[in-house]
């Protein structure tokens, strides 16, 4: 056999040996960045197990460093919601008549769908007016919520989107503000109500609170979150768009939500007390 013939035979044998290895490698790694399955809905980004883990760790660290990074908090929520927790929330909706209607209708919460100018004309203690007043006071908009993209199941992606867009209603009904102390209190409440891991992980941001804020969180608002979170009905099954004219006190009673201590008023009183104490000390000097 010629040299070229022997070389060709060797290459053929090597190819036969490597073929099973290549097949095994393909089975171990279902897809790569260059061979990714098509998205299952607009904006969907499929992730491998390791990519999802890296996203969870990176977004957790980043959001702890800067709790105002809504994009990182959103990514953390999606990366840690599967495979179990978002399905549990979806099943909670499927087991409830109103939840099933929400899944069928798939409403979206935006400034257009809610008609904010109309909400501002509703009675002062109505759900819609309370919501609009809270948005105006906090300077936020329902149009700023990130779209879900890292959850594979299309229906579960909507469930996460619904939770995300209802978050400001939870703020409005409880009266909790958007600064870190208020967000932590609401996240603790949401964790016990929804079991979404991100809401529980967010509580670790208490390390960024000042000593007085930390003491207040653990003595006042965390106990409130535990009581209300365990006692309240599944908030994901509230069809907010249909109860905008309802009395907010009546709604809290129906849902089993206790009104938390007014955080803004507490901070205001503490500032006044500190000011008086400072003036008293200056008067002595």
UniProtKB/Swiss-Prot annotation:
Top-rank EC class of the record's enzyme: lyase
EC number(s) on file: 4.1.1.130
The organism's place on the tree of life at top rank: Eukaryota
GO BP, sorted A to Z: ubiquinone biosynthetic process
Signal sequence interval, chain numbering: none
Cofactor section: Zn(2+)
Family: Belongs to the COQ4 family.
Function summary: Lyase that catalyzes the C1-decarboxylation of 4-hydroxy-3-methoxy-5-(all-trans-polyprenyl)benzoic acid into 2-methoxy-6-(all-trans-polyprenyl)phenol during ubiquinone biosynthesis.
Subunit structure: Component of a multi-subunit COQ enzyme complex, composed of at least coq3, coq4, coq5, coq6, coq7 and coq9.
Name this protein carries in UniProt: Ubiquinone biosynthesis protein coq4, mitochondrial
